[in-house]
């Protein structure tokens, strides 16, 4: 039995709890309630797996069916996991598409889940329902409450239309989740030695029962319950025990199929598995029916199914030979209140393996997988050296561990990303994030957890490293630590445990490890284009734009594939459109942006502006003679008309501005707010209007200076994804509007494409992007010279050593000025570290000094300030990380 579970009052519980001498022994009358709750958790896990496989409606139907059954029982027992599961599903949909109506629905559901969770905490405490081997009653619903609160706050924080006040409200909500998660996380860390001791006892009991050919029913989900039949007793013949054992087996089979990645398969194909069997495939399994009803025609023994690879949450640090130290006189389990002391990392570091290429990659949904460096082994093969610890961990304990680790990891990373413009709010809120700690938590969860938390952790990592917004600045690399110089890669796709030392290695070169996990998840969920989208992003981050676009295009072109979740389709189409823009395939890019008007309500104004900008650039390519067309004049007219049509239509859909924006919502609950890119396009088009007034004889298109498509490409991280050919085309296209005979202009005394004299403001925009292009072409000296002479010198008035930094506050293009100084920091780093005798500490300090200047120039709330601030902060954090490594 469990001893001393409540010798001390738990710091985790929000309410006072009774203590019971002699440990936790659930009242038999509560067994059904406990198993009902565990079954609810497994049902919720399965419903959320349906979403991950793009079968959202199946998941919703499952939750609704279970909720109806729950209501019919007229039980007073709450079921808070159901609204949370639905809220998580709606949260994922909302953050994929950022559609106001979807965000509002998720907001309402998560608010309901918050309230339901607190009711469930009270209920479990009141009736002393001990669902965990370690934690006090109600702990799991403190986690569901924290998860609901966190996701709700993120919905508020992730809206680009937020100002300082809205962000502050979200941060205060985050603090509520932070406090709960911090308390439980500390408890988990304190309890790990006890957890491992109990795990060893469970494994020993399992082994003994297998050797004695006893019943194969796992009681791990019912703390305090003893299967007397396994000890020679006869209570298993009692009807109530028969029912309990059947329910325990049902929960076990649900957990097993989920961990193996087969829970969404045809249930008729499910096999009974003896959790106590050895790993040999020749062993047999006794079904629960024969165990509890052997003399009434129960099912015969069935061959043991090959056990699939498990993702164990914790690994027993004690070698199997040491299990004997737990002799028969010490058969009782411990609880967390028995042991409160600090402990080191208990993980055993794994040897490193050479990375394998994806030569024989799976072809899922007829779309070829191009991810390089991923392990191509079948995920359905069991690693015989890997212990099945996960099957000895209760569903509730698994949820607590993975849930806290995911949510606390997300919190740490999100707080670390707060841009400088609203970072001051953090001092009011009273806490700050630790990016490295948060990333380690996310990596550990993604590697070791086979549930919604593990997959969400992976999704967060993929968005963080390979997403369209630059959260981490890969341009800053320590010499010799570039991915190309790493000769050995840890194999993580089948790991049940990961050490801190291994996580530190992973954090240095994450691009070598995300492909392994993504390949595994695509195998679990082959129907969801979301994972294919992530693979495309990964390829784009590697500079393989053609492969990335081909992967996405082949998927949507295949008549046998279907994307059920419209948000995923919209995200895939948007990303593909940007890839085409990076490749200068402007017809395809414009086609995709226009298609988005019909399937997504995120921002019609931005889609129209993007499409018009693509047609404008195609028009300029024909003008420059960069592409051949059959009928030049006809093509020019077509692309010119299309560009003018969409560019002029874009502002009519801007909230609070255009005639077509009356039904446009601006965030949760409406508000008619403009997003940053709404303000951006209005400003750009105002410049065109001003130019037309100054030059009334010029056409609309001829009044454009630097083409806006290059600015849009920059903010979606396109310059870091182009190859040499694409970069050279970019350099030429940027020169279209340049002054005659100016640096890197396409205009000279013999030919002049620009119809008005380039002003200083437009020239600064052009030169900024040309300097970045030159740097990407490894022409560092040319690029930094261009940036200094034609951009920074125009607004920085004093930058001498030992003198205060001074600048002119310019407003023509608000994002430009801090961005130029940020890019100057990157030039400093690359120029300094390219030398053999580089002084890395000096390079770090000089680069950081430019970032500090960037913060000073960019101080304030302006259009795109959040994106600019994130880039600056990402670079600063990266450089701070280097300080600890040299």
Curated annotation (Swiss-Prot):
Has keyword Transit peptide? no
The principal localisation class reads: cytoplasm
**Subcellular compartments:** Cytoplasm; Nucleus
Region Disordered: which residues? Answer: 207-238, 287-335
User: Per the record, GO CC terms?
Assistant: cytosol; mitochondrial outer membrane; nucleus
The record's keywords, sorted A to Z, are:
Cytoplasm, Nucleus, Phosphoprotein
| Low complexity bias spans | 224-237, 287-297
Polar residues: bias regions: 210-219, 304-313
Answer whether the UniProt record assigns the keyword Nucleotide-binding to this protein: no
Q: Which InterPro entries match?
A: Iml2/TPR_39 (IPR019412), TPR-like_helical_dom_sf (IPR011990)
Superkingdom: Eukaryota
Per UniProt, the ranges with Acidic residues bias are: 322-335
The similarity comment for this entry is: Belongs to the IML2 family.
- Subunit structure comment from the entry: Interacts with lipid droplet proteins.
What functional role does this protein have?
Answer: Inclusion body (IB) resident protein that interacts strongly with lipid droplet (LD) proteins. Involved in LD-mediated IB clearing after protein folding stress, probably by enabling access to the IBs of an LD-stored soluble sterol derivative that acts as a chaperone in inclusion clearing.
Name it: Inclusion body clearance protein IML2
Q: Give the originating organism.
A: Debaryomyces hansenii (strain ATCC 36239 / CBS 767 / BCRC 21394 / JCM 1990 / NBRC 0083 / IGC 2968)
Gene coding for it = IML2
């Amino acid at each position: 039995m469990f001893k001393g579970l409540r010798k001390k009052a738990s710091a985790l519980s929000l309410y006072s709890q009774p203590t019971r001498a002699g440990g936790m022994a659930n009242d038999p009358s509560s067994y059904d309630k406990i198993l009902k709750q565990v079954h609810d958790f497994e049902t919720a896990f399965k419903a959320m797996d349906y979403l991950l496989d793009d079968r959202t409606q199946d998941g919703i139907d499952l939750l609704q069916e279970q909720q109806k059954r729950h209501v019919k029982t007229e039980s007073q027992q709450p079921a808070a996991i159901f609204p949370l599961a639905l809220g998580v599903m709606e949260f994922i949909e909302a953050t994929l598409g950022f559609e106001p109506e979807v965000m509002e629905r998720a907001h309402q559901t998560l608010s309901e889940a918050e309230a339901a969770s607190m009711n469930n905490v009270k209920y479990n405490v009141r009736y002393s329902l001990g669902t965990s081997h370690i934690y006090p009653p109600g702990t799991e619903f403190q986690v569901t409450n924290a998860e609901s609160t966190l996701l709700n706050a993120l919905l508020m924080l992730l809206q680009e239309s937020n100002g300082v006040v809205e962000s502050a409200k979200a941060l205060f909500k985050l603090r509520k989740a932070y406090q709960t998660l911090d308390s439980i996380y500390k408890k988990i860390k304190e309890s790990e030695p006890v957890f491992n001791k109990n795990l060893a006892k469970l494994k020993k009991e399992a082994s003994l029962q297998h050797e004695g050919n006893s019943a194969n029913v796992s009681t791990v989900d019912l703390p305090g319950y003893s299967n007397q039949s396994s000890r020679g007793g006869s209570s298993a013949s009692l009807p109530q025990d028969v029912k309990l054992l059947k329910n325990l087996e049902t929960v076990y089979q649900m957990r097993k199929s989920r961990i193996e990645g087969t829970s969404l398969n045809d249930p008729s194909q499910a096999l009974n598995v003896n959790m106590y069997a050895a790993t040999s495939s020749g062993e047999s399994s006794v079904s629960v029916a024969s165990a509890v009803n052997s003399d009434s025609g129960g099912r015969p023994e069935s061959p043991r199914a090959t056990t699939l690879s498990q993702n164990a949450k914790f690994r027993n640090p004690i070698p199997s030979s040491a299990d004997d130290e737990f002799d028969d006189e010490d058969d009782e389990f411990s609880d967390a209140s028995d042991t409160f002391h600090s402990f080191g990392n208990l993980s055993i570091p794994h040897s490193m393996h050479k990375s394998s290429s994806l030569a024989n990659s799976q072809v899922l949904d007829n779309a070829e997988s191009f991810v390089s460096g991923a392990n191509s082994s079948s995920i359905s093969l069991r690693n015989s050296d890997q212990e099945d610890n996960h099957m000895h961990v209760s569903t509730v304990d698994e949820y607590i561990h993975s849930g806290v680790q995911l949510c606390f990891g997300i919190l740490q990373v999100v707080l670390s990303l707060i841009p400088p413009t609203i970072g001051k709010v953090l001092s009011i809120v009273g806490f700050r994030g630790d990016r490295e700690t948060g990333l380690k938590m996310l990596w550990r969860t993604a590697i070791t957890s086979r549930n919604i938390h593990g997959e969400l952790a992976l999704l967060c990592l993929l968005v963080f490293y390979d997403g369209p917004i630059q959260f981490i600045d890969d341009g800053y690399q320590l010499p010799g630590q570039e991915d190309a110089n790493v000769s050995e890669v840890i194999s993580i796709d089948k790991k049940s445990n990961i050490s801190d030392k291994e996580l530190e290695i992973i954090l240095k070169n994450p691009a070598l490890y995300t492909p392994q996990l993504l390949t595994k998840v695509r195998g679990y969920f082959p129907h969801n284009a979301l994972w294919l989208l992530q693979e495309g992003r990964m390829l784009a981050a590697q500079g393989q734009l053609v492969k990335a676009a081909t992967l996405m295009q082949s998927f949507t072109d295949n008549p046998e594939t279907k994307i059920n979740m419209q948000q995923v389709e919209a995200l895939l189409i948007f990303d593909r459109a940007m890839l085409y823009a990076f490749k200068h395939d402007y017809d395809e890019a414009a086609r995709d942006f226009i298609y988005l008007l019909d399937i997504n309500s995120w921002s019609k104004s931005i889609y129209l502006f993007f499409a018009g900008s693509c047609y404008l650039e195609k028009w300029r390519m024909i003008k420059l003679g960069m592409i051949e067309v059959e009928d030049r004049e006809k093509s020019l007219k077509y692309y010119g008309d299309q560009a003018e049509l969409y560019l002029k239509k874009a502002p009519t859909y801007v909230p609070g501005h255009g005639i077509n924006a009356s039904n446009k919502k601006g965030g949760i609950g409406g508000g008619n707010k403009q997003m940053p890119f709404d303000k951006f396009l209005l400003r750009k088009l105002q410049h065109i209007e001003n130019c037309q007034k100054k030059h009334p004889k010029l056409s609309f298109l001829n009044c454009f200076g630097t083409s806006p498509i290059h600015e849009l490409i920059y903010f979606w991280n396109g310059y870091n994804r182009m190859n040499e050919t694409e970069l050279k085309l970019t350099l030429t296209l940027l020169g279209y509007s340049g002054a005659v005979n100016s640096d890197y202009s396409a205009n000279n005394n013999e030919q002049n494409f620009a119809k008005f004299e380039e002003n200083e403001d437009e020239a600064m925009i052009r030169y900024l992007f040309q300097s970045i292009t030159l740097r990407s072409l490894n022409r560092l000296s040319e690029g930094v010279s261009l940036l200094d002479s034609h951009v920074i010198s125009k607004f920085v008035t004093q930058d001498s050593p030992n003198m205060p930094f001074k600048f002119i506050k310019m407003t023509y293009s608000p994002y430009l000025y801090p961005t130029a100084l940020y890019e100057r920091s990157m030039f400093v780093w690359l120029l300094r570290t390219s030398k053999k005798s580089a002084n890395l500490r000096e390079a770090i300090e000089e680069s950081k000094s430019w970032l500090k200047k960037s913060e000073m120039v960019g101080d304030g709330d302006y259009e795109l300030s959040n994106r600019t601030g994130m880039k600056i902060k990402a670079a600063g954090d990266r450089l701070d990380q280097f300080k600890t490594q040299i």
